[in-house]
Amino acid sequence: MEAERQNQLVARLEDYAEREQALRRYLDYDAKSERLQVVNAELEDPAIWNDPKHAQDLGREKKSLEDVVETLTELGSGLADSCELVELALADSDDATLEAIEHDVDRFQEKLETLEFRRMFANPADPLNCFVDIQAGAGGTEAQDWASMLLRQYLKYAERKGFKAEILEESEGDVAGLKSATIKIEGEYAFGYLRTETGVHRLVRKSPFDSSGGRHTSFASVFVYPEVDESFEVEVNPADLRIDTYRASGAGGQHINKTDSAVRITHAPSGIVVQCQNDRSQHRNRAEAMQMLKSKLYELEMRNRMTEQQKLEDSKTDVGWGHQIRSYVLDQSRIKDLRTNVEISNTQKVLDGDLDPFIQASLKQGV
């Protein structure tokens, strides 16, 4: 192995070792290691299953802790071993070992970058599950079909990330597609990953609904908000609520329309309306709708605070919550994020849920 390549290998190992130590401090490795031991001990106690919800919460916490603790432990051990091996290999001019270490260092780089990416999740709500609201804009059938395409895109994205996705509500279009839909996405940092998807998404294509093959432009809005838990205080006055029940519509089997199981809650002070129809039980739909309402109220408060902050900081971007964020020009094979200028030519791959290039760029640029 040539000298320059050897020097680069040594420099990379030194750099990664420093970054690994910095991550241990930033991610509080010692405290997480201790907490993981406590959680494991609790989960080993058979009595934990007397409270299934607590057991499930601990299971999720365990996975979150392991993602950090085990990765850093393996990374630290691997880097230490490689540093020792590279000294011996250099002394013996053992090129085969040096090349093997190079492959290991590539893996270390990937793990480091994954952990460092987590540092971008500074919002207290980033680790939470989230809801995604999709609303067709003006444009009739074309816009409603676009809304259904976006719904599929986010369901595919959730599948790619290993998240659980559930359609809570969908209002069918007049001819095709959807007027609106709400999905719940559960997974670690689901809100952190998806929050920058909030905004207006523009589609340009030759419409399949136009017999002349004309080029059409349509819009749909996406709004992402976190599922708040008990650690977030959200006060809701029952006197401010109007609760309506109705028969669910859309797919759901032969029993779905026989009872008024769907629930719609209107919060008078804010004008927020939420609805849920995914369960046959009115009680469960009502509980889910209340959770959605609290989450929307929390996000509304966060948005109001951000708006006030932006008024004080002239250097902030002028991209607002309702502004266009991404343009999907299918007949030119081009999808472009208007905030980060990231552009992808493989449009089908994006529509199949590969949103990582857009999301990562948005988070890195602090959109």
From Swiss-Prot:
Cellular location(s): Cytoplasm
Alphabetically ordered keywords of this record: Cytoplasm, Methylation, Protein biosynthesis
GO molecular function: translation release factor activity, codon specific
Main location: cytoplasm
Gene Ontology BP term (one): viral translational frameshifting
Keyword set includes Mitochondrion: no
This protein's GO CC annotations: cytoplasm
Modified residues (N5-methylglutamine): 254
Protein modification: Methylated by PrmC. Methylation increases the termination efficiency of RF2.
Family: Belongs to the prokaryotic/mitochondrial release factor family.
Miscellaneous comment: The gene for this protein contains a UGA in-frame termination codon after Leu-27; a naturally occurring frameshift enables complete translation of RF-2. This provides a mechanism for the protein to regulate its own production.
Entry function: Peptide chain release factor 2 directs the termination of translation in response to the peptide chain termination codons UGA and UAA.
UniProt protein name: Peptide chain release factor 2
Gene: prfB
